[in-house]
C-alpha cells in the first residue's frame, strides 16, 4: 500500500495496487546455455529484491504516518519482525529508497508512482542484469524506461547467470 502524501485527490489515502513488471535484458548469447540469460533466473534475481515491496507499506520519507505506523507495530510486537513474516527480501538502502523487511516498510525519497518504481527497480538491479527496458504497470498507470547497455556481463557457462565480483557463480559454484 502507498499514498501520495500532499496530493489533493483520491491517491492521498492509503491504497494498494497489483503491479506487473517487465524486464528486458540484452547481452551476447552465452554459448554454454545458448541464451542471453535464463528467464527463471531473471525472475529469481528480480524477486530477491522486489519481494520487499510485496505486502509492504511504501511511504515517502517525509510522510507523517511513518512514526505512527512504527508506534503501532511496536505495540503489536511486529516492528522487528514476526515468525509469520517469511516473504521478505534482504534489507537495502539506496539513494532512492530504504527497505525495512522485518516490518514490511519501504521508505522512498519520492512519491511512489510507476515512474518512481522503475527508477528504484533499475537502481537495485542494474549491477545484476543488463537491463535495456523496464515497464511497470499498476492499475491504469503504466510507464517504461529504456537504458543503454555498455558491454556484457561475465556469466556462468553452466547456468548462464552473472558471476559475482570474484568470478564465482552464486547458483552452481562455478569458478572462472
Task: Report the location of each language-model feature.
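Charge-rich, low-complexity N-terminal segments
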Residues: 1-145
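Long, C-terminal-biased catalytic regions of enzyme "large/alpha" subunits
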Residues: 123, 127, 135, 143-176
Amino acid at each position: 500500500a502507498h499514498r501520495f502524501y500532499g496530493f489533493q485527490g483520491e491517491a492521498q489515502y492509503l491504497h494498494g495496487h497489483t503491479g506487473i513488471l517487465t524486464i528486458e535484458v540484452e547481452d551476447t548469447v552465452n554459448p554454454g546455455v545458448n541464451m542471453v540469460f535464463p528467464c527463471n533466473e531473471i525472475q529469481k534475481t528480480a524477486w530477491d529484491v522486489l519481494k520487499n515491496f510485496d505486502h509492504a507499506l511504501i511511504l515517502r520519507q517525509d510522510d507523517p504516518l511513518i512514526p505512527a505506523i512504527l508506534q503501532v507495530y511496536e505495540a503489536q510486537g511486529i516492528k522487528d519482525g514476526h515468525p509469520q513474516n517469511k516473504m521478505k527480501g534482504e534489507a537495502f538502502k539506496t539513494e532512492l529508497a530504504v527497505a525495512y523487511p522485518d516490518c514490511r516498510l519501504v521508505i522512498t525519497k519520492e512519491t511512489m508512482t510507476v515512474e518512481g518504481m522503475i527508477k528504484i527497480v533499475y537502481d537495485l538491479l542494474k549491477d545484476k542484469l543488463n537491463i535495456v527496458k523496464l515497464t511497470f504497470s499498476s492499475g491504469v498507470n503504466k510507464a517504461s524506461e529504456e537504458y543503454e547497455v555498455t558491454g556484457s556481463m561475465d556469466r556462468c557457462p553452466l547456468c548462464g547467470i552473472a558471476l559475482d565480483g570474484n568470478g564465482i557463480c552464486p547458483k552452481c559454484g562455478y569458478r572462472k
